[in-house]
Curated annotation (Swiss-Prot):
Stretches the record annotates as Disordered: 85-105
A single MF term (Gene Ontology): DNA binding
Listed name of the protein: Nucleoid-associated protein ABO_1774
Species this chain originates from: Alcanivorax borkumensis (strain ATCC 700651 / DSM 11573 / NCIMB 13689 / SK2)
Homology family: Belongs to the YbaB/EbfC family.
GO cellular component, one term: bacterial nucleoid
């Protein structure tokens, strides 16, 4: 089996271009994290910027601590969703690149 360095370089360049595109898409992707069965929702982008918070009006009569807990849980849910989305995207991209034998992405 011959090792073609030129082919490998072309594939690396193509992968670099895919990576840049994926990073741009990931930064612009948005997810909604939820808590309290959807009573608190947090919208977050791929840069982990919180773009919006939606709190059901029924929670306004609840105590401050409950609302704080639900808000923290919704933010954490959004972070997990963004990270999962980015991880899945990376795995899909890496699946198209021929890694050398014994190397796992």
């Amino acid at each position: 089996m011959d090792f073609d360095i030129n082919n490998l370089m072309q594939q690396a360049q193509a992968m670099q271009e895919k990576m840049k595109k994926m990073q741009d898409e990931a930064a612009n992707a948005e997810v909604v994290g939820e808590s309290g069965a959807g009573l608190v929702k947090v919208t977050m982008n791929g840069r982990h910027d919180v773009k919006g918070v939606d709190i059901d009006p029924s929670l306004m009569s609840e105590d401050k601590e409950l609302l704080e807990d639900l808000l923290a849980a919704a933010v954490n849910d959004a972070v997990r969703r963004i990270e999962k989305q980015q991880q899945d995207s990376m795995q899909n991209m890496a699946g198209g690149f021929p890694f050398p034998p014994g190397f796992k992405p």
